[in-house]
């Protein structure tokens, strides 16, 4: 079965077309990447060793073309919007990673995603060797650095399990992207965008408790308290041990307070 690396970029295209009303088309967003593929093919010979081709691709993308992550504002939702990323050469690590995977597949280069717990990592496989690349800036990451990141997330002494550095399960990668996109929109209170995106995701996954939870959070921000209450109660009932459940229970108390205010207004 083919490991379809362009699919993560497809998720970005779908995301932007759902949330945006700026007239961008799927053909335009794919054409932008097609232009980069043509430029890369002019610069990278398929006759070179794979290591050299990978090195040159990273130099082109992060060096010559100037794609980067800005440490001051990389977390803003706009860094997931493809037109913004192409215009400003700036995005989140996952955005830039998706673009590198697209280029790698077009050039037949063995670069794959890793669902590392702390962030997306790129995995280059050449012969029997594996190297890891940070999509933030295209630099190589040592095993020691990966271990430091892991301990930073899970505590001193926590050890990376070998399977955590394998090629990503694509369905998990897509779910992780969808959650990141929802979180960014909700955090910035882009409520209409978030609601439309979640509604679209639920066309094929209507009972997903995380989509229902996030719809509830959006509805709460929009002031639709009874509907929000219903969604958040559903989530707590179905995912009581989820790490976010305690926060959601607090939200439920606040929502009930807001509903009671509306039911018994002060005179």
Curated annotation (Swiss-Prot):
What is a single Pfam family found in this protein's UniProt entry? Answer: TPR_9
What InterPro entries does UniProt report for this protein, alphabetically?
SirB1_N, TPR-like_helical_dom_sf
Positions the record marks as coiled coil are none
Q: Which family does it belong to?
A: Belongs to the UPF0162 family.
What name does the UniProt record give this protein? UPF0162 protein HI_1558
Q: Which organism is it from?
A: Haemophilus influenzae (strain ATCC 51907 / DSM 11121 / KW20 / Rd)
């Amino acid at each position: 079965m083919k490991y379809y690396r362009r699919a993560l970029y497809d998720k970005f295209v779908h995301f932007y077309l759902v949330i945006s009303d700026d007239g961008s088309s799927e053909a335009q967003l794919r054409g932008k990447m097609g232009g980069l593929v043509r430029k890369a093919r002019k610069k990278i010979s398929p006759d070179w060793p794979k290591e050299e081709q990978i090195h040159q691709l990273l130099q082109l993308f992060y060096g010559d073309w100037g794609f980067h992550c800005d440490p001051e504002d990389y977390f803003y939702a706009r860094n997931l919007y493809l037109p913004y990323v192409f215009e400003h050469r700036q995005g989140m690590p996952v955005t830039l990673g998706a673009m590198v995977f697209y280029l790698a597949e077009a050039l037949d280069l063995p670069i794959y995603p890793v669902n590392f717990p702390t962030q997306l990592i790129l995995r280059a496989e050449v012969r029997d060797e594996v190297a890891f690349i940070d999509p933030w800036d295209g630099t190589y990451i040592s095993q020691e650095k990966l271990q430091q990141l892991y301990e930073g997330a899970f505590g001193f002494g926590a050890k990376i399990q070998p399977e955590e550095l394998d090629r990503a399960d694509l369905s998990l990668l897509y779910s992780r992207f969808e959650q990141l996109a929802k979180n960014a929109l909700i955090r910035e209170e882009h409520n209409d965008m978030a609601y439309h995106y979640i509604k679209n995701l639920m066309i094929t996954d209507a009972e997903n408790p995380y989509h229902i939870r996030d719809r509830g959070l959006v509805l709460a921000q929009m002031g639709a308290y009874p509907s929000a209450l219903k969604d958040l109660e559903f989530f707590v009932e179905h995912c009581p041990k989820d790490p976010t459940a305690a926060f959601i229970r607090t939200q439920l108390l606040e929502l009930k307070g807001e509903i009671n205010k509306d039911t018994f207004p002060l005179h």
